[in-house]
């Protein structure tokens, strides 16, 4: 196997796919490498990010939730991006690559529906057909996003096999692509999967961290003590981390979904509580049974409900450059409510996991002077019905 770029991060990553898909992956890598060196492609991408998506996004200082502590907390506002989440960044890049390769169709998978919405809007903008695979359970719990996708002309295909969630949608999307790659581009939604996707997605998300670095230096005159992001597959987190990896004074903290609690087994934290295996075209930590079957992941947030994690996160964890922790459903929900009530911002449940860890750091050491940045990866409009039902069942509303 000869590739232009290194397909591994330490021992993690690779291209564990059927032989039939190798030409498609090689073509994609070649297109990406040439596009990265092409000023015209870069100018087109930058123009879409600025004038269509609305970059740069704001870096907002929290006014109220840090009261009584010595923490300064900023939110990187990816929730303000067109489409409602960080997902829009990299799909614009991938859609331009698809056009560059002469493809006419986009295949995508989605969990929370945010990547589906982003894929649909990019396809509509650039005149590409779009079909999106989504677990049947996620279709139910994310109905507003399903309608958004269909409004923009995408075909949404519910997947009923397995657990009817994101991992099953990924499997169906790959199956489709293996028979249609000559005309279709598979628009993978996270920094995981077979090479070159983890690298492509990181590079098409790295403006998150680049902007954050410039903005925090402008506002505070120094780098943050830590940047914090939620981790499912890990695209928003690697986008935030990438530009800080060589700044060793900056802590990188990834927050996995602890679900009902790690001890219950109902979580989505393979990085700290899984075992290394082969899944979704890559070698990475994953949740698996004693005999190596992929175990069901669980999270209150559909976008974190994924049984594996991107290979660069696995590598950063293995060398100790990044720390990975977990936050339960209940902790994320409390953070969601806190931001709504005290800052007037409705965060996605995914992003609420990262916020919850920042609040925990703040509460545990109120006397510690610390400068933290949370990547607020998406807005919570899609989650209000889920939160409403939980709060109603608890008698809180």
From Swiss-Prot:
The beta subunit is responsible for the synthesis of L-tryptophan from indole and L-serine. HAMAP family: Trp_synth_beta. GO terms for molecular function: identical protein binding; tryptophan synthase activity. InterPro entries: Trp_synth_b_CS, Trp_synth_beta, Trp_synth_beta/beta-like, TrpB-like_PALP, TrpB-like_PALP_sf. GO terms for cellular component: cytoplasm. Belongs to the TrpB family. It holds the Pfam family PALP. Its EC number is 4.2.1.20. The gene is trpB. It is an enzyme of class 4 (lyase). The modification N6-(pyridoxal phosphate)lysine is found at residue 87. NCBIfam families: trpB. The lineage of its organism: Bacteria, Pseudomonadati, Pseudomonadota, Gammaproteobacteria, Enterobacterales. Tetramer of two alpha and two beta chains. Keywords: Amino-acid biosynthesis, Aromatic amino acid biosynthesis, Lyase, Pyridoxal phosphate, Tryptophan biosynthesis. It catalyses: (1S,2R)-1-C-(indol-3-yl)glycerol 3-phosphate + L-serine = D-glyceraldehyde 3-phosphate + L-tryptophan + H2O. The keyword Lyase applies. This is Tryptophan synthase beta chain. Transmembrane segments: none annotated. Its cofactor is pyridoxal 5'-phosphate. Gene3D superfamilies: 3.40.50.1100. GO terms for biological process: L-tryptophan biosynthetic process. Disulfide bonds: none annotated.
């Amino acid at each position: 196997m000869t590739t232009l770029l290194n397909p591994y991060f330490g021992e993690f990553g690779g291209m564990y796919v059927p032989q039939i898909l190798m030409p498609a992956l090689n073509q994609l890598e070649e297109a990406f490498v040439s596009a990265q060196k092409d000023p015209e492609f870069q100018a087109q991408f930058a123009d879409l990010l600025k004038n269509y998506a609305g970059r740069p996004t704001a870096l907002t200082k929290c006014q109220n939730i840090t009261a009584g502590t010595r923490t300064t907390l900023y939110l990187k506002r990816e929730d303000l991006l067109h489409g409602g989440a960080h997902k829009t960044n990299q799909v614009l890049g991938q859609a331009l690559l698809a056009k560059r390769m002469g493809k006419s169709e986009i295949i995508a998978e989605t969990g929370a529906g945010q990547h589906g919405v982003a894929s649909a809007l990019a396809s509509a903008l650039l005149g590409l057909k779009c079909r999106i695979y989504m677990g049947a359970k996620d279709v139910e719990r994310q109905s507003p996003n399903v309608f958004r996708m269909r409004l923009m002309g995408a075909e949404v295909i519910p997947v009923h096999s397995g657990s009817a969630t994101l991992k099953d949608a990924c499997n169906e999307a790959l199956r489709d692509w293996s028979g249609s790659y000559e005309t279709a581009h598979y628009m993978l939604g996270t920094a995981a999967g077979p090479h070159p996707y983890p690298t492509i997605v990181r590079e098409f998300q790295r403006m998150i961290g680049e902007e954050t670095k410039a903005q925090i230096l402008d506002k505070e005159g120094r780098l943050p003590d830590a940047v914090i992001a939620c981790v499912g597959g890990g695209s928003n987190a690697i986008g935030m981390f990438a530009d800080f990896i060589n700044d060793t004074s900056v802590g990188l903290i990834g927050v996995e979904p602890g679900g009902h609690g790690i001890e219950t087994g109902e979580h989505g934290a393979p990085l700290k509580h899984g075992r290394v295996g082969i899944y979704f075209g890559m070698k990475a930590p994953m949740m698996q049974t004693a005999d190596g079957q992929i175990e069901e992941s669980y999270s209150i947030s559909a976008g974190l409900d994924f049984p594996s994690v991107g290979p660069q996160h696995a590598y950063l964890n293995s060398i100790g450059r990044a720390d990975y922790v977990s936050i339960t459903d209940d902790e994320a929900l409390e953070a969601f409510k806190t931001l709504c009530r005290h800052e007037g911002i409705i965060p996605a449940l995914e992003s609420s996991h990262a916020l919850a860890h920042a609040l925990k750091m703040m509460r545990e050491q109120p006397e510690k002077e610390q400068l933290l940045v949370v990547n607020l990866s998406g807005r919570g409009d899609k989650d209000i019905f889920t939160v409403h039902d939980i709060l109603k069942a608890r008698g809180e509303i």
